[in-house]
Amino acid sequence: MSVKELLIQNVHKEEHSHAHNKITVVGVGAVGMACAISILMKDLADELALVDVIEDKLRGEMLDLQHGSLFLRTPKIVSGKDYSVTAHSKLVIITAGARQQEGESRLNLVQRNVNIFKFIIPNVVKHSPDCTLLVVSNPVDILTYVAWKISGFPKHRVIGSGCNLDSARFRYLMGGKLGIHSLSCHGWIIGEHGDSSVPVWSGVNVAGVSLKALYPDLGTDADKEHWKEVHKQVVDSAYEVIKLKGYTSWAIGLSVADLAETIMRNLRRVHPISTMVKGMYGIHDDVFLSVPCVLGYSGITDVVKMTLKSEEEEKLRKSADTLWGIQKELQF
């Protein structure tokens, strides 16, 4: 008899059923691994699968995480180049793609990443036809559209990480300005994740007190306190981090884990994430932009209708036009 047989008496032969709360991360670069560790630390999955094309790096990352199993509560961590390892995932997070170079705009990355998605998405769909897709790769709004088109999934199951991080950065900077923790600072950034994002100044508040009502110049050119700079810093922050360390990873990883938690635990929290906005705010094309969405186990169930100023709506429409201009040129 083996040591195992001497030690353990079997009571019930388990059926080999698949995981119930499986999460896949596609792409094990800095962002993918930051997402993976953040998800593991939150105990959101009973199985985590990693996929990439670089096999040595992939296996190394898997082993490194497995060796930390004692300190985690995710019993199974797997990886492979073949998408069969992703089978039966509830949530698939796409971080793979060409990386943004210093000074390169997110929109410049597009066609490089479309070609990568043409390989990834059909493989994901084949093995997890009922999953929710969470796109993180940039430019995220366009690539969420691309993932939606290629996958054939209903729009509520294809989500872009969008402005969840932009809004978090905004609240962090707002907290710094006011000397209050960012959790108590409320403000929403919507629209494109990137250079043309829209800060909704009318909704910025602490404890329900509107800053715009207190100080009508907030966010305008007449503002002596330069709150507009806070939004500019949000837009510039990724470029600054990329310039200093070569890429961004931790904040986006934490932001994605925040979204994963809402989905896997069916929390129905409201997040500014990228969804199909056709028919909203006078937008007529198939574009994905961030608006406040109710998120849960089945993806996006509802959208909160924000009261926007005419110039804010105009900015959203302008973003939509820019994105559509690029999307209609894409080769699928």
Swiss-Prot record:
PANTHER family: L-2-HYDROXYCARBOXYLATE DEHYDROGENASE (NAD(P)(+)), L-LACTATE DEHYDROGENASE A CHAIN. NCBIfam families: L-LDH-NAD (TIGR01771). Pathway: Fermentation; pyruvate fermentation to lactate; (S)-lactate from pyruvate: step 1/1. Homotetramer. NAD(+) binds at residues 29-57, 99, 138. This is L-lactate dehydrogenase A chain. Gene3D superfamilies: Lactate dehydrogenase/glycoside hydrolase, family 4, C-terminal, NAD(P)-binding Rossmann-like Domain.
